[in-house]
Amino acid sequence: MKIEPIWPNGARLALSIVVDVEEGAEMSVADGDSRAEAVDEMGMMVKPGIRNFSNESNYAYGIKAGAPRIMDILTRRNLTATFTAAAQSLERAPDIARRITDDGHETCAHGYRWQVQHNMDEDAEREFIRRAAQSIEQTTGTRPVGWLSRYLFTANTRRLLIEEGYRYHMDDYSDDKPFWDTNTETGQPMLILPYAIDTNDMKMWNAPAYTPKDWADYLNDTLDVLYEEGAEVPRMMSLGLHLRIAGRPGRAAALESFLDRVNSTDGIWVATRAQIMEHWTKRFPPSNL
């Protein structure tokens, strides 16, 4: 069934800029974990119990230099984003937490720490989800309404999110537009706002890695296709960023180039995920399904 474009002001495409804030919440021997964080730009794997000081400093760069650079880029273009934050990161970087709120961005929960939850029992996962929301509300002044896991989650996750008052879930890669999960255990529909790996700046970290120019070209091609399709059906594009990745100068230049193209193109609605959630819920309420 053809669905006419439905974004505000007749926009053909909704662009969701997502900024992951994970630095300071990653695995760390210094924080009592058995091993150092495995996600490392240099690809170094160290034995359990050994600190990876180099990787720790790379994550610290995200907080010290990457965060202000990315936030300045957004501010100069009057753009808002969804900051998917591991709560502990914001506890350790209160200035960033305050600026997220002051600049009009949204904070989405990305766990309490940046850790997988697939191996948690139900009680532990519930506490993990609840603690993240409580902490983010304390540091930013606003309780998160969305959730993004670190890769793996459980069969209980979506039900627990509903029970804890979350209103959208990002752990899905199956579409280019929002949709309702009406088959939840609670019987209460959950709005799914799909994310995307292919446009994520992690593509400049993982081998074989994109150059910043490769990444910008891919973003532009993605925008072209979704923008054209958006004349007929609703389309949403996700742009995933990390403080320690896109926050580096050469990569930030590619980001700026793409965002300048976005700002110069009519018919693109740059919105937080909470804004997309509210708009979709009003336009396509689950009661009409």
Q: What residues fall within each predicted segment?
A:
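Catalytic alpha-helical scaffold of carbohydrate-active enzymes acting on polysaccharides/glycoconjugates
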Residues: 1-191, 216-239, 245-289
